[in-house]
């Protein structure tokens, strides 16, 4: 592995005995699985591995060398991996379903999603409409000075426009307003006020000239703004456009300087500030921004916000400072900035040239070399907006109840393994340990899809306000549908939550989630596919791949952030101080370990602080999924013989298959520009390190491959938490 270990790591202080070590009277036997699914799995591994490499020296190259060689990054992508290939497959499948959906045997809401997709795909109608629908949108928001000759700010009220785009589009510039569970009373939804996201990366915005690479990205962003304005107003003065673009970037830079970086927001006590709207008015120290009026504009169709209404204010200083900044800023700059953020989010839904502008910026930012096809854009967009309706189509065709039950059983086996880990660790006091076990037992498993989407009446009721789709006027339909979908979330304000029915995702998604405020894991149907899961293949592979994904989300309940919430997801400190100190010491081991790695393409060190939660989860996932696999062997034994399924044509043992199943899902390559971006901002480490670092911390891996102590894959010093 082409990385350098630069600092000493924490020494493992304890180790739990695996089930295989505790029951030596069972005879272990292997049998080759020759079923079609096992033959497919064997072929996939053989085509991925470079067996000329010593696995104890460079396991990533051993597991992934051939896969990387055979899979160059496509021009339109910033990265390629088996997970990306799975995502592509799901999108292709969904696109075919949406193209061919008819009124026969489909719920009304499902047909609306198909019509929406087909309208999105009508490139000719888009070009006929041109940019006029976008210009009309911006006009309704007070105009965009860059594209509006003679614009006057005399009657422009930026607060009203921010509230309007928040309500109608879910776009939240300057101030982020959203409805979510109250983190300290998760049975109820509450209004949340937070710092906004930006059009450019925070690090670049804070210091616009910090490096030649930053200057290149900022220049690309500036060109993106100017080119977009030119599409709306071809006759605009170039000097004025350049000046406006510079003012937008400088204003956004100041916003970013007021913001708090993500690694400083991992402790909930830093952002959970519950108070009344009247108190927000006081602590933000202003008389020119009326919070009650602003929030009632956001929540226009819903119960009235009063001065005594409680909200959560995340960032007091940011909010106070940006309100003062906005008050002192020329209305033209405010209107240009808000209009730009709207245009950046929605412009590419109009003409081909807008999509070209977006591509030119992404070419600089993340290194892609070709624009993504419209079909891919429309599929992803439709899933994002009407995901439950699309998900219904997907699960009806591509997910069986048999598979769901099989994976549910796998989840419970990993939960049992985790419970064993908690019971047997030596660093937790018994009070904290018991509370951790209570939380684990209360953790909700949301598998594949919410059951209510299978009921036509319930699904139609959920989307009842979605209007009929006009295929000739896609952008108009987009605005109407978006407003309805955003109203569904805003409409939850002041209503109770439902830990079972409320999902954080929709079914046709290739990802997995842990939600701290509901203490629940979600595994959408999209991710429950090969190469992560295959019904009937070697259990070692399933436990190593989808089992590790499950273990990863389960571990999030006990990482540096998830560990701050109780079994119902409320912010509660349930740790005794001595145990908390030991937890922090072990978490610091991971911070130092990952920060010591140098990513060779970018010559950048990993950010062990921002990624610590994900790294804790990756390491806990591998350890507990392996324990669960061993437990599975015990439970499936017959006449005191544990039969391990191996694969044809491979000399790998079942234990080795487990670790190959884990690492091969992280095979891949990523463009340098994208890697630079992800190392700065992503809470996950790059795939190569996810594939390997948890294995260097695993004694079971070293035993499976016979790696001597002190080899790269079995270092003397290891980090261990769960």
From Swiss-Prot:
Q: Where in the cell is it found?
A: Secreted
Taxonomic source organism: Trittame loki (Brush-footed trapdoor spider)
Q: List the disulfide bonds.
A: 33-38, 56-707, 64-667, 120-378, 589-719
Q: Which GO terms describe its biological process?
A: protein processing
- Lineage per the UniProt record: Eukaryota, Metazoa, Ecdysozoa, Arthropoda, Chelicerata
Query: Cofactor note from UniProt?
Result: Binds 1 zinc ion per subunit.
Which UniProt keywords are given for this protein, alphabetically ordered? Disulfide bond, Glycoprotein, Hydrolase, Metal-binding, Metalloprotease, Protease, Secreted, Signal, Zinc
Tell me which cofactor or cofactors this protein depends on.
Answer: Zn(2+)
Processing after translation: Contains 5 disulfide bonds.
* E.C. numbers: 3.4.24.-
Enumerate the active-site residues. Answer: 553, 618 (proton donor)
> What is the annotated tissue distribution of the protein whose record heads this document?
Expressed by the venom gland.
Q: What family does the database annotate? A: Belongs to the peptidase M13 family.
UniProt GO MF annotations: metal ion binding; metalloendopeptidase activity
Q: Which InterPro entries match?
A: MetalloPept_cat_dom_sf (IPR024079), Peptidase_M13 (IPR000718), Peptidase_M13_C (IPR018497), Peptidase_M13_dom_2 (IPR042089), Peptidase_M13_N (IPR008753)
| This protein's name | Neprilysin-1
